[in-house]
A protein has these predicted regions:
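Glycine-rich beta-strand-turn "strand-cap" elements at beta-sheet edges
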Residues: 39-57, 82-102
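Short amphipathic alpha-helical segments
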Residues: 14-40, 79-87
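Generic structural motif
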Residues: 11-13, 68, 101
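Absolute protein N-terminus
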Residues: 1-2, 102
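Short, well-ordered beta-strand segments in beta-rich or mixed alpha/beta enzyme
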Residues: 2-9, 39-75
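Generic structural signal for secondary-structure transition and capping sites
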Residues: 27-30, 34, 70, 92-96
Length: 102
């Protein structure tokens, strides 16, 4: 199983717009062969000293895929190309970590 943690920082004030585009694209991703889960997450407010907040402009996408091949097909899909095209002008940065269990 492949896990992905994508940390996405929107331009100031643009996070909600990016999350709306994410939500519109999510059903197509969940329908892909090999997609186990695909979810956007934000900070839990006021959680305390244990938390390192992402911040008001940042969210993470937590993904699980059956295989590396399924993840590669996801990256090559037309709906992800469109999602990337529409969100790119709204983003300050993104960091993608592709992981496997040890």
């Amino acid at each position: 199983m492949i896990h992905v943690i994508a940390t996405i920082t929107a331009l100031p004030g643009s996070r909600d717009a990016v999350l709306e585009l994410f939500s519109k694209n999510r059903p197509a991703v969940l329908a892909e062969n090999g997609c186990i889960s695909y979810e956007a997450v934000i900070d839990v407010p006021d959680f305390g000293a244990i938390q390192t907040p992402l911040g008001t402009d940042t969210f993470a996408v937590i993904e699980r895929w059956e295989s590396a091949e399924a993840l590669k097909a996801h990256g090559a899909s037309t709906h992800m190309a469109e999602y990337g095209r529409t969100t790119k002008p709204l983003l300050a940065s993104r960091v993608i970590n592709v992981l496997e269990a040890c």
